Amino acid sequence: HPTAVRTTLAGIKEAYPGRRLIAVFEPRSNTSRRAFFQDEYPVSFDACDIAVILEVADAGGYQGTARQVGALDVPELTRQIMRRGKTAACFRTVKEIEDFLCREIRSGDLTVLMSNGDFGGLAQTLPRALQRVLRNNTPK
């Protein structure tokens, strides 16, 4: 829900001023996957520095729902967030998000994963992927 996204991100930004905040969002619930909140979601990401969103077509394994009438248009949501002066990206798969985050995350960044499900296991795979990147980039 846009209010939950907005208050979560605003609270984190307030608690950690000066830190770069990366919001990673999976619109998985029936409510969040609908276009009903299309115009409310962009404002919800104002407190973050980077918004990363899983396309509805892959969110929660509901293949094809992005094509349904009334589904949240994630590419358009991404453009709306960018028009508000934020960096934003959308991806079709969790693996693409993981790869993007491994390139983007820097020391000191705060990364929050938002989903009402397991986000394709991202909370488990991302730390391991970041550790591999760190090991590969450490001078020997």
Each model region followed by its residue ranges:
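ATP-dependent carboxylate-amine ligase
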Residues: 1-140
